[in-house]
A protein has these predicted regions:
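Non-catalytic terminal regions of proteins
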Residues: 1-55, 64-65, 169, 173-408
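Active-site-adjacent bridging/hinge elements
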Residues: 17-18, 120-136
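Post-HEXXH active-site segment of zinc metalloproteases
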Residues: 30-34, 50-92, 134-138
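Short, solvent-exposed segments of well-ordered alpha helices
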Residues: 31, 35, 143-150
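Low-complexity, serine/threonine/proline-enriched polar segments
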Residues: 70-123, 313
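Cation-handling catalytic/transport regions enriched in His/Asp/Glu
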Residues: 111-120, 139-148, 157, 169-170
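A long, hydrophobic alpha-helical segment
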Residues: 128-144, 165-166
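An active-site-proximal "capping" alpha-helix that borders the catalytic cofactor pocket
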Residues: 149-164
Length: 408
């Protein structure tokens, strides 16, 4: 499982889980330094991307199917083949997540056919964006594949920068990739961060966001298109491309029914909350395909805060754990508060299992939370092998789910 992360926080796709490397008090949120507030906004942006873009839906299906394979007793080769296919394409569309050398300076960008994917899956006929950078001689350069992951991180950085005075990043992978690509390919469009943010947001509505981003940018240059508003960009894209938030509610519900099976605990509020986040994502996209950028386009900073707070209020907040092991959530359905605590258990178990579903020796991922909360179910075994926790003074959710999944 790959996290989306920067130096101060991370977001775990599909599991709707935010982790911050700082202590944060949401009762006094605005009293924190801009860097702390910006980090939260950055990771929260990934949550919005997860529940309102094709990129997020693809991550949910891929990662959750992989998790379900790990916990199944009956594992067959057919399931593994399907999982490998989905994961290969998901990883391909996501592109590279790190590079060998920073800072990076773009030398050339090209869209090419991927021969490796074609060899593995004949007839797939997929394009990829290759970015050559830090060129020293004619044939000596570094390169990376530009895909959804770079776009998601670039967008999240632009969002946090639009709301708070965070540290400026320059030529830093992956946060400045979309900015630098726009400067290299269409400098006139790169003059406005909001325009770049909007193109990022619209690109994440496509399966193959990388090639779409480049093709759309090239078309804008060809047409000498210079927007005056975010709405102009949305209308331009709608004129030449058919894009939208693609996903299947039935698939999400089917996956969740296995992650949270029927038992003596009622998981229906959690499942309903997750499904309704995607439904809200669809509703926001119907209002505007780039509603995040639209909410931040005003030059009035208070208007940006107000609109962003409306989005947060509507979507709520997934489980968030800070550096001190304190965890926060903000979920409700029909004005009734929903407890998301059980969502931590599948996430923890996923980290404790390898791709074959075998236990990886090590501490429980929730140990800091239990230590901070002085949880009665916590014991020293949690630091070595949480399966051997013999403390009977409390109910350990990880151990409970472990038994429910019938894991060894």
């Amino acid at each position: 499982m790959r996290k989306l992360f920067d130096e101060s926080g991370s977001y775990l796709p599909a599991f709707l889980y935010i982790e911050l490397d700082q202590s944060i008090d949401f009762q006094n949120f605005e009293n924190h330094p801009d860097e702390v507030k910006g980090t939260f906004i950055h990771e929260y942006c990934h949550f919005i991307q997860d529940v309102s873009t094709t990129y997020g839906y693809s991550n949910f299906v891929c990662y959750m199917q992989d998790f379900l394979y790990k916990i199944r007793e009956d594992k067959n080769s057919c399931d593994r083949d399907i999982l490998d296919y989905n994961r290969d394409f998901n990883d391909f569309y996501n592109g590279d997540t790190e590079i060998k050398e920073e800072p990076f300076f773009i030398s050339e960008i090209e869209i090419v056919k991927d021969e490796l994917v074609e060899d593995l899956y004949p007839g797939s006929n997929v394009d990829k964006v290759v970015v050559k950078y830090n060129k020293k001689h004619e044939e000596e350069y570094k390169k990376f594949q530009f895909g959804s992951r770079c776009i998601a991180e670039s967008m999240a950085y632009l969002v946090e920068k639009r709301l708070y005075k965070v540290q400026e990043r320059n030529y830093e992978f992956p946060y400045n990739v979309c900015e630098e690509i726009c400067k290299h390919e269409y400098a006139a469009f790169a003059k406005n961060d909001i325009w770049i943010m909007a193109l990022c947001e619209l690109s994440l509505l496509e399966w193959d966001a990388g090639p779409f981003f480049i093709n759309a940018l090239h078309l804008m240059k060809e047409k000498e298109f210079i927007p005056t508003t975010v709405r102009d960009i949305e209308l331009f894209i709608d004129e030449y491309f058919k894009i939208g938030f693609r996903g299947d509610k039935n698939v999400i519900e089917s996956i969740l029914s296995e992650v949270y099976p029927k038992c003596n605990i009622d998981f229906s509020p959690i499942k309903k909350w997750i499904v309704t986040r995607y439904e809200l994502g669809c509703e926001f996209r119907e209002i505007s395909k780039c509603f995040i950028s639209m909410s931040l386009c005003s030059e009035d900073i208070q208007a940006r805060y107000d609109l962003w707070n409306i989005i947060i209020k509507e979507l709520g907040c997934p489980v968030l754990v800070d550096s001190e092991g304190n965890w926060t959530e903000g979920a409700n359905l029909d004005n009734i508060e929903i407890d998301l605590a059980y969502m931590l258990a599948p996430m923890a178990i996923d980290k404790l299992l390898n791709h074959k579903g075998e236990f990886i020796p090590g501490p429980c991922p929730l140990k800091s939370i239990c230590q901070s909360a002085d949880d009665p179910s916590y014991s020293e075994e949690c630091l070595v092998d949480p399966r051997k926790n013999t403390n009977i003074n409390g109910l350990c959710p990880v151990k409970g789910f472990w038994r429910m999944y019938r894991l060894k």
